[in-house]
Amino acid sequence: MTYVISDLHGDLAGLRSVLEQIRLRPEDTLYILGDVMDRLPDGVAILRWLMACPNCRMLLGNHELMMLNYLDEPSERNRWQWFRNGGEVTLKAFLALPEAERRAITAFLRARPLQAELRIGEWNYLLVHAAPLR
């Protein structure tokens, strides 16, 4: 079975609830269409879980992009934009990690696509957090 969710925004309890409902098996695939972080406190924990989940596929959402923008260029403008959207809680949890783990999470995020194409039976799907690439 293929499952698609998005916009967890740091809600680890919500993710656990979804996992209980779907009973994700090794042969299933779970797509998460971005925005796993910010607003609620467990975005980094969700990222760590995704990094260890062999049958999970994560796409970038605008919140992950805001984080990467800030990490690339920690300007006041990028900080303000990210924090205005709930990023302060994520940055605090991220900075509490050892440097090696921060690098691993950053590399994981940089390797995530913005969209994915999926074929199930005779149907084609374009998975994306917001608007498709042009």
Where do the protein language model's features map onto the residues?
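Short, well-ordered beta-to-alpha junction loops that form the rim of enzyme active sites
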Residues: 121-123, 128-132
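Active-site neighborhood of divalent metal-dependent phosphoester bond hydrolases
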Residues: 40-118, 122-123
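N-terminal active-site segment of His-dependent metallophosphoesterases
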Residues: 1-47
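Generic structural signal for short, solvent-exposed loop/turn connectors between secondary structure elements
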Residues: 1-2, 23-29, 51-57, 97, ...
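Conserved hydrophobic/aromatic beta-strand scaffold that supports enzyme active sites
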Residues: 26, 115-117, 127
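Short, solvent-exposed loop/turn segments at secondary-structure junctions
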Residues: 9-10, 38, 64-65, 131-134
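Residue-level marker for buried hydrophobic side chains located in beta-strands
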Residues: 4, 32, 58-59, 126
